[in-house]
């Protein structure tokens, strides 16, 4: 069992802005792209997670859980858990989003909404993850037009 899986049993995730996979891969997630991070990272510590919503995905293959860091309520957390072994496939932490508290499945995508209007969008298990923040929206740079 990985360190991430062991810590998740106590609802703890790495204190790292971005997506951390159970195999050790790390990604930065942005509005229009995600990129692998190759340099050594200083993760800091671990965050305790208060789960605010959860939703089963794809007929019982996965469970997506979202919430906030108990230490600081403005930090949003999303975890994709395998229902085969109840271990995290990946964890996502954002100190720009506020807590994530709603999950919507639409058109094959998972949309996780935060209390500030931020949206984490992904296809499970990990396809094209994007983080849309309300103040950096492509619509805001386009005068609010769609």
Give a label for each model feature.
Residues 2-22, 44-61, 65-66, 93-107, ...:
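Repeated scaffold domains used in trafficking and secretory/extracellular systems
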Residues 34-36, 47-50, 70:
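Sequence-structural signature of mature extracellular/luminal beta-sheet repeat domains
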Residues 38-46, 86-94, 128-133:
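A short beta-strand motif characteristic of beta-propeller blades
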Residues 59, 74, 106, 115-116, ...:
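Short loop/turn segments that connect beta-strands within the blades of beta-propeller domains
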Residues 65, 112-113:
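Conserved beta-strand element within WD40/beta-propeller blades
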Residues 71-79, 118-121:
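Structural motif
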Residues 115-146:
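Alpha-helical oligomerization segments
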